[in-house]
């Protein structure tokens, strides 16, 4: 059983829960309208604890990278609270060391292992190895969220915007964000990202290509086609970004994981 716990996004006027009711278009309008950046809040340990009380033999949670969010530590505490009352439960919290579509791929890997009839410990070992082999890349159209969060100075954001410089970003093995490259214009940045994806995958035919996009399905399709021209994959998934991913990717952002 995969335990779901929704993060919240708060701005001056609203609290938005990142769940199935999330309205991406409405959220993007609100983000564009407010000068201040919305803030995200991870689920409390008690929220995870309630999820871990599900009647299932094996329980798993997949969290946003521990280097980017308090979700992993919160889930681990929720696990400890649950095991105090139910010491026989089998629970594992996976630190995705990724975000967005990367977490989706990990959840699918867990499902695959469970459907194959693996023992709990074997599932954990297999999925941990999968996480270590996974790569995440992204390109942002809009740098305003990074600027509003204090991760990019106003001057740098304005210069980047004026010069149409788009960073090509990735996740480190530890789950932090790094800049891999940059390019003048979004299309050139996406081409560079495709290059990095191709160079980073040796056995792509056994992997799922996963792409999430923030309000730019045509751009996601273009990235998919560019990658499939250069590599074979087992399957392709394209999804809209959810709440927290939309907050950081911002309108026009593209995330790729394999």
Listing of model-derived features with the role each one plays in the protein:
Residues 176-258:
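Gly/His-enriched, cation/cofactor- and phosphate-binding structural elements
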Residues 14-75, 80-84:
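Class I S-adenosyl-L-methionine
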